[in-house]
UniProtKB/Swiss-Prot annotation:
Belongs to the scoloptoxin-16 family. This is U-scoloptoxin(16)-Er11a. Keywords: Disulfide bond, Secreted, Signal, Toxin. InterPro entries: SVWC_dom. The keyword Disulfide bond applies. Expressed by the venom gland. Transmembrane segments: none annotated. It comes from the Eukaryota. GO terms for cellular component: extracellular region. It comes from Ethmostigmus rubripes (Giant centipede). The lineage of its organism: Eukaryota, Metazoa, Ecdysozoa, Arthropoda, Myriapoda. Residues 1-19 form the signal peptide. It is found in: Secreted. One of its GO terms (molecular function) is toxin activity. Contains 4 disulfide bonds.
Amino acid sequence: MKSWTAAVLSLGLIYLSISQNEGATTEFPTMNYEGRCALDMFTLIEVGDTFNYRHACLSYTCMKRDETFYVQVHTCDAPHFENVTSGMICNFTPPTTGNFPDCCLKVNCIAHLNHTSAN
């Protein structure tokens, strides 16, 4: 019984590691807690990565333009750009107020010391 359980757990871990590496799109869950957006997460931004947020009309795309890296932020209103470096870690923080689907997230980027190349 123990070996069967270990085999199932091993297969589950392999599946998780494979599924996390598929494609460049990552979805993160959001919650509506007392009428506010609840999402506070650090994630590694790579060039070409797109982040889609379920239950909120937001997406972030890391892109390169004129040798400068940006995170393109699509909100309910209009897209705008946040200047970032390849391999930066972005902290997605909920606004102080806002209900679905009108909530928009702030993006704060900090340097990732082990991932500084701009290739």
